[in-house]
């Protein structure tokens, strides 16, 4: 959606959520694969990727998609597919939230120690777990920083607004190669 500035129709602005901006950033970052399992509040990030990939990741001659987006049967399958895509040279990612990170931790260690580039979007909920909206905290930060068993230190990016979501998403795919 575009809206006009109150002062003039010359200035146009894009209204976009952080999740949709991250999905668009993933497309600009070169992502061609997304695997995800529906979990609030991250589902709209994968949907944003699909929306923009349909526009920007299509062969102009044949009309065939140059991307894949898979709704997995669970969080383990979602991260496993993303690891497999990256292992085979694609730029793939998954999107989840805190409980999904907990379930993905063993595979996150596999990617880390096998040095397989991987981007995981953790769209954090307001509380420490499901059903805890009155006690907010940032527990996902440590869960992500040291995800898996062993001595892991993952790169974490913390966007503050939709512009950061776009920029950090696009850059995350390059950072995953470090």
Predicted features and spans:
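Single conserved hydrophobic/aromatic residue that forms the stacking wall/gate
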Residues: 1-7, 11
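Active-site mouth loops of central-metabolism enzymes
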Residues: 12-16
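Active-site pocket-lining segments that scaffold enzyme catalytic pockets across diverse folds
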Residues: 19, 24-27
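Acidic, PIN/NYN-like endoribonuclease modules and their adjacent C-terminal/linker elements
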Residues: 37
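Thiamine diphosphate
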Residues: 40-144, 155-176
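Flexible glycine/proline-enriched surface loops and loop-helix/loop-strand junctions
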Residues: 150-153
């Amino acid at each position: 959606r575009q809206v006009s500035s109150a002062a003039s129709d010359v200035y146009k602005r894009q209204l976009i959520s952080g999740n949709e901006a991250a999905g668009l950033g993933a497309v600009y970052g070169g992502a061609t694969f997304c695997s995800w399992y529906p979990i609030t509040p991250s589902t709209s990030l994968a949907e944003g990727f699909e929306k923009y990939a349909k526009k920007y990741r299509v062969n102009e001659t044949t009309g065939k998609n140059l991307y894949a987006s898979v709704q997995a049967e669970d969080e383990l399958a979602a991260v496993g597919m993303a690891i497999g895509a990256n292992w085979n040279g694609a730029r793939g990612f998954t999107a989840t939230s805190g409980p999904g990170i907990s379930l993905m931790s063993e595979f996150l260690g596999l990617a880390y120690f096998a040095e397989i580039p991987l981007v995981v979007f953790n769209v954090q909920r307001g509380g420490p777990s499901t059903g805890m909206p009155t006690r907010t905290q940032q527990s996902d930060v440590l869960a992500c920083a040291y995800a898996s068993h062993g001595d892991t230190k993952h790169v974490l990016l913390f966007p503050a607004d939709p512009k950061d979501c776009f920029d950090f998403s696009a850059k995350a795919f390059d950072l995953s190669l470090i």
